[in-house]
């Protein structure tokens, strides 16, 4: 049950009964009417702009219209009070009986409360991480991995048919460098003194086992092959080994993709997929032969002062036209991007989300141009950019040199502070804003550590259930029993907690629509704060305690509230990819 959608419908129904609305109904649009929590909770439980939106087309003042709407709403038994504020906003306070029914609805829904059908099963492809398969995941990949994964979880909960995809960049020049780096480690494993790793190769020790495995399997045979022969063998083995490492790193972060798509598929069979994509754009009039003027600043690697085959991307929103085929007949990296988008579109995705690092900001317009051209405007592409993560320890910048290279790996961070801390904190700021990650703060057991505070709220719920079983022994805490007891909830602070629970469906829909999974983390912290605050009131006010061993029925009512809080916490934590613990250790 979405409280705000429910009362938006009730307000629209009330409007339909007003004579002045009936007279001009064909001229009116209710689309801009919004019902939301008031900025100040003391003003009521819901607020609407209905009178402000419709006053001008109806030719009356907002306050007059608000009074008319308010009189109609007062006929609703679920509304305890209606008041007009400011220039014509309506504040609504709901009856205790309504809150009791809503609580019963949360209990019945369990962890499915808030699940939405907004997506209506529409297919969405979320591509994230897509790190080059040249080494272990570093902390720079971490934020995009978490944001992409949580966004995919959120969209699935909102009713979309989501595919989590990883694009393996295994066809570029970096793979040649990887193969040569591994071949050096292979020679080293055969006993050759290779000395210092040459500049331009990957120096990390993580390549040593790959070289050793090749030496064990092939002996000196690879060494005796011409480069064009051993290169393909080493490429295959190196990519496979790197992807095993990357999958393990992602699994440590509880990130699991549905599909790993190899760029080499696009280059197979004489690059048939790329050729087909370019032919398709040519047929649609988006391709021409020409020479690009030199761009200002540093020249991109695909620019050359010769005639090339170009994508007319400026006609579909890009800043410059983009090369597809170089003067020597080879395809550009961008040509593969076009083919990859077309492949997704041909797989039935008309909604695609790319989660990229902030350093890929220059790709946004060209990808959007590809989407418009390939799909003829039928597909929607969204690029989310994740800003940098800076590591600190007790406020001091972290500088760490690891055996895997001169960077902090994702695994380093997860092993030090735990998967849940990493995931939740990566979401505890909007992805477009830089994030400071302090190792000391994310392991504190205090209100200042959001992941601890939220998980502690769930663990506290579980502790209350254990306390109830100790107090009453055979007490039945099944949802049916707890639903039936909700009429015992009457205290204002209890109603405030239900009101916070009632926001969850709206948060889900709004977060999915704006593609902002961080809003789930913020909401969970607010809910945990409300729950902890209510629990603390029980210290001084025994009548508010969740378990009263002298009153089984009132305890059941409050245990229903605990069940509802635990369910929503568990649901939200699942979206963030974080555990809901039974107890804190």
Swiss-Prot record:
Its EC number is 6.1.1.19. It is found in: Cytoplasm. It catalyses: tRNA(Arg) + L-arginine + ATP = L-arginyl-tRNA(Arg) + AMP + diphosphate. One of its GO terms (molecular function) is ATP binding. One of its GO terms (cellular component) is cytoplasm. The keyword Ligase applies. GO terms for biological process: arginyl-tRNA aminoacylation. Keywords: Aminoacyl-tRNA synthetase, ATP-binding, Cytoplasm, Ligase, Nucleotide-binding, Protein biosynthesis. Pfam families: Arg_tRNA_synt_N, DALR_1, tRNA-synt_1d. Gene3D superfamilies: Arginyl tRNA synthetase N-terminal domain, HUPs, Isoleucyl-tRNA Synthetase, Domain 1. The keyword Aminoacyl-tRNA synthetase applies. Belongs to the class-I aminoacyl-tRNA synthetase family. Monomer. This is Arginine--tRNA ligase. It comes from Allorhizobium ampelinum (strain ATCC BAA-846 / DSM 112012 / S4) (Agrobacterium vitis (strain S4)). The gene is argS.
């Amino acid at each position: 049950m979405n409280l705000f959608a429910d009362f938006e419908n009730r307000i629209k129904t009330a409007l339909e009964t007003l004579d002045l609305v009936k007279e001009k109904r064909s001229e009116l649009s209710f689309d801009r009417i919004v019902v939301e929590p008031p900025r100040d909770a003391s003003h009521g439980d819901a607020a609407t702009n209905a009178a402000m939106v419709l006053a001008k087309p109806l030719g009356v003042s907002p306050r007059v219209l608000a009074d008319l709407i308010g009189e109609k709403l007062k006929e609703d038994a679920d509304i305890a009070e209606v008041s007009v504020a400011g220039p014509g906003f309506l504040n609504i306070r709901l009856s205790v009986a309504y809150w009791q029914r809503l609580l019963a609805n949360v209990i019945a829904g369990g962890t499915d409360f808030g699940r939405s059908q907004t997506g209506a099963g529409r297919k969405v492809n979320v591509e994230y991480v897509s790190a080059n398969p040249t080494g272990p995941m570093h902390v720079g990949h971490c934020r995009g991995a978490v944001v992409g994964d949580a966004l995919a979880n959120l969209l699935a909960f909102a009713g979309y048919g989501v595919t989590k995809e990883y694009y393996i960049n295994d066809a570029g020049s970096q793979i040649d460098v990887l193969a040569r780096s591994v071949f050096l480690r292979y020679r080293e494993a055969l006993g050759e003194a290779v000395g210092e790793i040459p500049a331009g190769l990957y120096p990390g020790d993580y390549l040593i086992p790959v070289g050793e495995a090749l030496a064990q399997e092939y002996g000196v045979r690879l060494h005796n092959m011409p480069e064009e022969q051993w290169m393909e063998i080493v490429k295959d083995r190196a990519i496979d080994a790197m992807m095993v490492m990357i999958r393990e790193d992602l699994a440590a972060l509880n990130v699991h993709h549905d599909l790993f798509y190899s760029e080499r598929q696009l280059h197979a069979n004489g690059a048939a997929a790329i050729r087909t994509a370019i032919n398709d754009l040519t047929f649609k009039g988006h391709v021409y032969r020409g020479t690009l003027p030199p761009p200002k600043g540093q020249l991109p690697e695909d620019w050359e002062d010769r005639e090339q085959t170009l994508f007319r991307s400026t006609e579909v929103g890009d800043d410059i036209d983009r090369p597809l085929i170089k003067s020597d007949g080879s395809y550009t990296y961008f040509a593969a991007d076009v083919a990859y988008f077309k492949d997704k579109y041909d797989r039935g995705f008309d909604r695609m989300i790319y989660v990229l690092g902030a350093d890929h900001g220059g790709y946004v317009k060209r990808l959007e141009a590809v989407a418009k051209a390939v799909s003829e405007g039928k597909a929607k592409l969204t690029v989310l950019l994740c800003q940098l993560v800076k590591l600190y320890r007790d406020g001091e910048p972290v500088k760490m040199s690891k055996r895997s290279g001169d960077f902090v790996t994702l695994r380093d961070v997860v092993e030090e502070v735990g998967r849940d801390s990493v995931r939740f904190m990566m979401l505890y700021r909007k992805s477009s804003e830089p994030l400071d990650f302090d190792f000391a703060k994310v392991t504190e057991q205090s209100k200042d550590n959001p992941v601890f505070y939220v998980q502690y709220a769930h663990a506290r719920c579980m502790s209350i259930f254990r306390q109830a079983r100790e107090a009453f022994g055979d007490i039945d805490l099944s949802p049916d029993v707890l639903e039936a007891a909700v009429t015992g909830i009457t205290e204002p602070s209890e109603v405030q907690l239900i009101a916070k629970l009632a926001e969850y469906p709206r948060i889900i829909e709004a977060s999915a629509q704006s593609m902002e999974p961080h809003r789930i983390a913020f909401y969970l912290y607010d809910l945990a704060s409300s729950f902890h605050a209510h629990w603390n009131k029980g210290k001084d006010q025994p009548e508010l305690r969740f378990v009263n061993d002298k009153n089984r029925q009132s305890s059941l009512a409050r245990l229903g509230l605990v069940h509802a809080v635990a369910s929503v916490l568990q649901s939200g934590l699942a979206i963030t990819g974080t555990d809901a613990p039974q107890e804190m250790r």
